[in-house]
Amino acid sequence: WYKFANSLKLRMAMRTCYVAGFNVNGKTSQQLAEEAVAAGVMTAATDGAYRKVADHNPWQRFMVLWSDARISADLTCYMNAYNDPRREAYYDKSTFGTVSGNAYTGEESYVGLRRGILQGQYNSWSQGSSCMKVTTSDNIVVFRASEVAFLRAEGALRNWNMGGTAKDFYEEGIRLSFEENGITSGVENYLASTGKVEAYKDPLKGQSAQTYDYSGAINTNVTVAWSGGDFEKSLEQIITQKWIANFP
């Protein structure tokens, strides 16, 4: 609980860093963040905080049992571009592979549901998209050590005393996320990845009645491999990987 409280303090301090004049009892966001780290935050995958499910995991209920939601196309576009091994832990492969003319094969058979899908196409289109892997008894994620590492990476990028460099904490966050999701290989290749995110591809392209343009264009050129140098680009890398690691 002590590590959890300090980790939460670090998260709150980081979220206030852009608030002009912010302070608590005269302490700035930087001072509060440095206090939290010095007092001890979550550093190991086993430090993570989870809520035990008393009856039925809600993600399983509406994702699997009710089949009312699917993985976001935004997430799969990033993870496919980075050839992310965590896909197999996060969600299953789509069923579009059985559709004639489907462009998705092999590792690219992870297909998310884009925003703005027509309600009338629910059964014929959205049901084929990748679904979250979750069971009725899975615990609910509250706070993971990987997020703490990314928070420390952001702090270090701002030249706050986080106990290490932005690059080291960034890469540690990715390693912790792999461990938290049971992925035992591929992390070094992932850390060296220079793949860039591409626009969403319609898995049913060529079938005019079910082909959609995606207005949610992805505008980024960040890679997984740490670039260093430019503050905004490094910050985008940290936030992108934190977003992926914080699934769901």
Model-inferred region functions:
Residues 178-248:
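C-terminal functional modules
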